Amino acid sequence: MRKITSILLTCVMGCTATYAADWDGVPVPANPGSGKTWELHPLSDDFNYEAPAAGKSTRFYERWKEGFINPWTGPGLTEWHPHYSYVSGGKLAITSGRKPGTNQVYLGSITSKAPLTYPVYMEARAKLSNMVLASDFWFLSADSTEEIDVIEAYGSDRPGQEWYAERLHLSHHVFIRDPFQDYQPTDAGSWYADGKGTKWRDAFHRVGVYWRDPWHLEYYVDGKLVRTVSGQDIIDPNGFTGGTGLSKPMYAIINMEDQNWRSDNGITPTDAELADPNRNTYYVDWVRFYKPVPINGNATTVELGNFHNTGKDGANVTGDTVLGFNKNGNNINYNTKGDWADYTVNLPAAGEYRVDLVIASPMSSGLGAELTFAGNAAKTVTLSNTGGWESYQTFTLPQTISVSSPGNYNFRLKSTGSSNWQWNGDEIRFVKL
């Protein structure tokens, strides 16, 4: 059932500090904002495992599925095929080949099982294929109306393709699907060249986007800020999003494509190119995702799975077989309207504390939490959709708490709001101000 946090993914979330990831020591180039720091998101993947083309592996399927966000098999001559992606030697490989007896092209595509939402920094270390095909790392909403392209590039060394080989397409789209309308920026800055003649197929490069908010994107190449798009005039000048900008949760997609605008002009791979393993593969060393969270140098943290009593106020919810919070490792799930749990926290000093709650939920509305601390009047916070049951975000209560002396304090955390199904919980933090 989707409301159950997988034990393996919980370990990934809770244990990221216990092993060295490939990106350790590589700073996030974007600024998380005043009083904030970067927190690694569990969708991050260093691909340091094996997943064969046919059958993949449990580790792969924790985060990814083969194919697209829906049954569509790709643009133009593309046909995404599950056996044209694999993980080996510490890298994800997206490959290509001819579909027998046709002019179509088999290509690999993988899509994240859970979406992401702003604010988030998303980056890949990748090496383009040496093909006229697009090598892609991009993000798309479930209804295919909002898109962010981190990597969209064409690495071929074929004569006549030099201009594209030296550029990365750094862009986004907003769509109306019926009748179909598509906007993306067309300014010169959307095609990035570093001025050094770099061919992006020749080596691995880091390309990232900080999706700061619905109206602001920052693009980074090898740690350098190379493009910023900000404001309605460039994000959505035609109002296709109805004034909300790039606001919808989006799924991560890594794939290759034979795109119409190229194949319609005769720019499509030959059989020889498709059969050449030295050019037909797009490699991704790692992908990483970070959320900006408050700095917690003076924080006391309580894991939400470490309650000493739990229960429920109100009627049972259909499908919820657990009374109160369900302990799942250090986290909680099966949380429905009216569920509560009691905790104890040891605060190190007298004074005022900010309270941060780390939760995840795909529910579109009606989410909330209530904190009753040391028997005082309850404090409430309205929560919102984070993009999935495993996409955790930090929410800060609008009111602080104060204690007159250090020591142990009891508190109760309760789910509130109109939605029957509420949120999965990670931790609550008390930050000394």
From Swiss-Prot:
Catalytic machinery residues: 147 (nucleophile), 152 (proton donor)
Domain GH16 intervals: 21-295
Signal peptide: 1-20
Activity sensitivity to pH: Optimum pH is around 7.0.
Assigned EC number: 3.2.1.81
GO molecular function terms attached to this record: beta-agarase activity; carbohydrate binding
Temperature dependence: Optimum temperature is around 55 degrees Celsius. Is stable up to 60 degrees Celsius and retains more than 80% of the original activity even after heating at 65 degrees Celsius for 15 min.
InterPro entries for this protein: Beta_agarase (IPR016287), CBM6 (IPR005084), Cellulose-bd_IV (IPR006584), ConA-like_dom_sf (IPR013320), Galactose-bd-like_sf (IPR008979), GH16 (IPR000757)
GO biological process annotation, one example: carbohydrate metabolic process
Official protein name in the record: Beta-agarase AgaA
Organism: Microbulbifer thermotolerans
